[in-house]
Each structure stands twice: as structure tokens, then as C-alpha cells.
Amino acid sequence: MDALRLANSAFAVELFKQLCEKEPAGNILFSPICLSTSLSLAQVGAKGDTANEIGQVLHFENVKDVPFGFKPITSDVNKLSSFYSLKLIKRLYIDKSLNLSTEFISSTKRPYANELETVDFKDKLEETKGQINSSIKELTDGHFEDILPENSISDQTKILVVNAAYFVGKWMKKFPESETKECPFRINKTDTKPVQMMNLEATFCLGNIDDINCKIIELPFQNKHLSMLIVLPKDVEDESTGLEKIEKQLNPETLLQWTNPSTMANAKVKLSLPKFKVEKMIDPKASLESLGLKSLFNESTSDFSGMSETKGVSVSNVIHRVCLEITEDGGDSIEVPGSRILQHKDEFKADHPFLFIVRHNKTRNIVFLGKFSSP
């Protein structure tokens, strides 16, 4: 479990850095656990360089039995939909002309239940597109309509990866709605945009990351199954969003150091956090190629002979759509009466860009990773 967590974190960080290069000042959001689960399913049917590249990019070198490693995380996170509005949908759609081998079907059945679907891209393209769109819409309770953009599939599509993930959090401690005020959010040194700023005074786990002049806070969601970790620069110091130093120094090792519970302690905090919603449709293909997935998308070099005897099979497209919404909503915040008096309070005022992680606490896996740069 630990090896898989480290692998997932390393992949998350590397893909995040790729996405930041593409959009230095934009909001970023993706679900690393969705992508790595889907790619690990594709790896079961891959051989040779294709299988090796997936293993390297996803950092599976030290992970024993990858497919069953994902199963407890996936089933655990799926159970959380009774506490939160949370869905992680991962699908591999395969054209029926591939005649999947019985070995591939049986080896993926248990660890990837419901994640593999055979469809007809070749002869019933429009019908298949409609089926995928309506299926994802239903699975995400209507959050995502028409997940497949124009020209995302063709009658030549053999393998399609579709991820759809959304989360509307409910906090352990509710933010009082009467305290939410419009405030300026500094998107850089000179410009601001108005934002609805939520305010709460309570005890949270707080830490300082001196190397990058940042603070980090852990905000638990209801029942503490998930937490949001926010890394906030003490000020906007660069000419961009103020996150350049974090993005430069971020790697799998530094992320582990920054989020290590031993570097944080409980403190009384005066917290200000914007209400926000980030919805992203990312096309991770180019980023995954940059990380080393060279043959996966290339018909002339990909090898999916572990899945089918058909030659020239590659992954045609990866659709990754995610949405995260943060509001005041949460449980009743019970603070001890009188405990506020005469106590020093730390301030955590997220009125400028920050990096955030939504973590599954039991397995410490990253469910969502992103940055909020602008309302």
C-alpha cells in the first residue's frame, strides 16, 4: 500500500508540473488516482515497451500486484459517496473488433470491476458516443453532460480512456454563512478580483514550510475520511501568481516533507478561504507523452498483445474531466465556550493563489491535486 501511495504521489506531482507549464496563471485540477487506475488497467493488456513505459511513468517499479493495489483505494473512496457528493468514474472503452482475450478479461474482472466496457466505434460511432455521454451523465448524477467533445472519437478509435470526477465537500467544521464577505483576491502583485471569502475561527493543523516561505493547513472534511491540504505562500513574491517557488521546488520528495504530519501542529486559526468552484477538462495526452508514454498513443509502436491479437492497437484518446466545489457547508462546529479569549490566533488568509490537495486519509492517496489562481 505504501509503495503504491508513493508511486501515485510521484505521478501526481510530475503531471501537475507539466500542467502548470502549460497554464502558468490558470486554475489547475485533476484526479491523479483516476488517471493512474485507468492507465494501470491498460497496462494489464500491454506488453514490451508499452507496458514498461506505463510502469515507469506511474512509478510502479516497487509496487507488487498493481491491479489489486488499487482495489482497496477505489472501493474505499467509492463508499464515501454516502458522506459527500463525490464520484470518481474511470472507464476504458474498447472497440469490439479487438476480440479481447479471455485471459485479459478474467485478469481484469475482479480488480477493475465495471471499469472495462466493449463498444462499437467502428460501425455505430454516433450511437456509441451517445451511449458513453448518457452513461457518464447518469454515473455523475448529471454533473457532466456530453463528456466527449467533438472529434474526440472516430470510427478508427480502438481504446478510449474516460475519467469523470467531481467533489462537493462538506467540512468537519462548517463556515458560518453570515461571516462570508466579498473580498479582493490578489491574482498577482497588482491585480485583484472579487471573491466570496468564507471566515472561521477554529483549531486546525498548521505548519510552516520555511524553504518556500509558505504555510500549510489541513482542513478535514466531515468524518475525516478526506482532508484538504492548502499550501499558501506568505505573500505574492514573484511576477506571476506567487506560486513559482513552490512549483519549482515541488517534487515527490518535497511534497512528502511538506505534508508530513510531524511538521504540523494544532493551533487556533483565524481562517479565510474563498468559496470556489474549479471545473476542468484536461487533455493529458501531450503531458503523458512528455513524461515518457511514447508508444501508448502510437499505432506503429504500441503493443497491446496482452489484450488482443489485433495489430496496430493504441490508446486513441484520454478524456479527463473534473470538478471541485468548495462552500461553507459542513458539520456543526463545536468550539469550547470561552476558549477564544486571551489566546493567540494564527492567521491563514488565502486571499492570493494557493496549491491544494484532497487526500484520502486512510491510505494517504491524493484524490485531487490543483491550484487556485483566480476566481
Curated annotation (Swiss-Prot):
SUPFAM superfamilies: Serpins (SSF56574). Keywords: Glycoprotein, Secreted. Disulfide bonds: none annotated. GO terms for biological process: extracellular matrix organization; morphogenesis of an epithelium; prostate gland morphogenesis; regulation of epithelial cell proliferation. Pfam families: Serpin. One of its GO terms (molecular function) is serine-type endopeptidase inhibitor activity. The record marks R340, I341 as: Reactive bond homolog. Belongs to the serpin family. Ov-serpin subfamily. Interacts with IRF6. This is Serpin B5. The gene is Serpinb5.
